[in-house]
Regions:
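ABC-type ATPase nucleotide-binding domains, specifically the catalytic core motifs of the NBD
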Residues: 15, 33, 55, 71, ...
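Helix-to-loop junction immediately C-terminal to a conserved catalytic motif
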Residues: 51
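Conserved ABC transporter NBD signature motif
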Residues: 59-68, 79, 112-117
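Conserved catalytic motifs of ABC-family nucleotide-binding domains
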Residues: 155
Length: 240
């Protein structure tokens, strides 16, 4: 079976400085794949290349067999790709309800949108509790739940997550991690997870790619990488 997402020899530059060097990777249907590495390793650049926020210089990006490099972001949403950016970018003055509905901007069947909204609220009960509250008044963890829920409102096939644990209290990090596992398992949504907390990323993903200075340094099954001495030394801060 053809992979859902394929990167083939992708190179990306910021001005004359390379961000990605000959990167090749795959995400299969129903799979969670993690991208780990230090700041500046190229993890977020991969997501920006997928979503069209950065134009690649060479290589190909395919989704369901179709080339998507160069396509506008709204077209990618319609194709089934949703992005949760780093930094919990909610609309702070808008209510939780209106933030969620913004995620369904490409959908026109009101009944289906209402069903999706109810499913999102069932998955994140805190959002139901704060349904009429301004998003900017919620905690960081609650806002992260909100932007994940907003992405799910588009009914994606592939969910891109950029540093979902960043700046969140430890208990809520675990809640977010469990939510990612449940979304993948229950809704059959494929997930490409960028996460600097490599330990959590490897525990909730099936496979992973470790990046260094814009290139893939290591890849494999996440369970195996968790016990790889090179990964422990470079990405996990020593022994688990």
């Amino acid at each position: 079976m053809e992979p859902l997402l394929t990167f083939s020899g992708v190179e990306l530059y910021y001005d004359q400085v390379y961000a990605l060097r000959n990167v090749s990777l795959e995400v299969n249907e129903g799979e969670t794949v993690a991208l780990i590495g230090a700041n500046g390793a190229g993890k977020t650049s991969i997501l920006r290349a997928i979503t069209g926020l950065r134009k690649i210089r060479s290589g190909q990006i395919r989704f369901r067999g179709q080339r998507i490099d160069g396509r506008p972001p709204d077209e990618l949403v319609k194709m089934g790709i949703a992005m949760v950016p780093e930094g919990r970018r909610s609309f702070p003055l808008m209510s939780v309800k209106d933030n969620l509905l913004m995620g369904a901007f490409t959908r026109h069947d009101k009944a289906e949108v209402a069903r999706t909204l109810e499913a999102v609220l069932a998955r994140f009960p805190r959002l139901r509790e704060r349904y009429g509250q301004a998003a900017g008044t919620m905690s960081g963890g609650e806002q992260q739940m909100l932007v994940i829920g907003r992405a799910l409102m588009s009914r994606p096939t592939l969910l891109l997550l950029d540093e979902p644990s960043l700046g969140i209290a430890p208990k809520l990090v675990q809640d977010i991690a469990r939510s990612i596992v449940a979304i993948n398992r229950d809704e059959k949504v494929s997930v490409l997870l960028v996460e600097q907390n490599s330990r959590i990323a490897l525990k909730i993903s099936a496979r992973a790619y470790a990046l260094s200075t814009g290139a893939v340094a290591l890849s494999g099954r996440s369970a195996e990488l968790l016990n790889d001495e090179r990964v422990k030394k470079l990405y996990l801060g020593g022994e688990l």
